[in-house]
A protein has these predicted regions:
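Alpha-helical transmembrane segments of multi-pass membrane transport proteins
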Residues: 3-153
Length: 153
């Protein structure tokens, strides 16, 4: 039941925000940043990373992605590449303190007596792997766009 309510609320918020011109305001703000296009993408991913500390993936995907997708397209980036990069960024933020949703899910199924600090220490290699994966995807778009290009032309 919770997921349906979140889905409904996030969709309603996104529609109201876009209906009131919030998407145009955000697009204008992002495009006016004093960065090159890759800097704007990094700023979007950084904001997404920070939001991932506090919001679930459904909210972020339904609210943030539709707002930044036109900016990404206008900058000339592949939408498949950006969406995968966005998803990896979200996953990384879910592993990272201060909140770390994935860590608390793991704590719920871990045997009694394992402290959260041990789980935080154990997740560090996975965070490093996620960040390396993001860097690879960011610098070599073909890693994630080659297969869809082969499948869909």
């Amino acid at each position: 039941m919770y997921k349906r309510q979140v889905l409904l609320g996030a969709t309603a918020f996104s529609l109201v925000l876009r209906g009131l011109g919030g998407d145009e305001l955000i697009e204008g703000a992002l495009l006016s940043l004093p960065f090159e296009p890759t800097g704007i993408i990094i700023a979007i991913l950084f904001a997404t990373f920070l939001l991932g500390f506090f919001l679930d993936w459904i909210e972020l995907t339904l609210i943030v992605l539709p707002l930044v997708a036109p900016v990404v397209a206008s900058l000339g980036f592949d939408p498949i590449w950006f969406t995968i990069l966005f998803a990896v960024c979200l996953q990384t933020s879910f592993l990272t303190p201060p909140v770390g949703f994935a860590i608390f899910y793991l704590k719920g199924v871990a045997p009694q007596g394992i402290p959260v600090t041990t789980i935080y220490a154990g997740v560090v290699p996975f965070i490093i792997a996620q960040v390396l994966g993001m860097l690879i995807i960011f610098n070599w778009q073909a890693v994630v766009t080659w297969l869809p290009a082969q499948a869909y032309g």
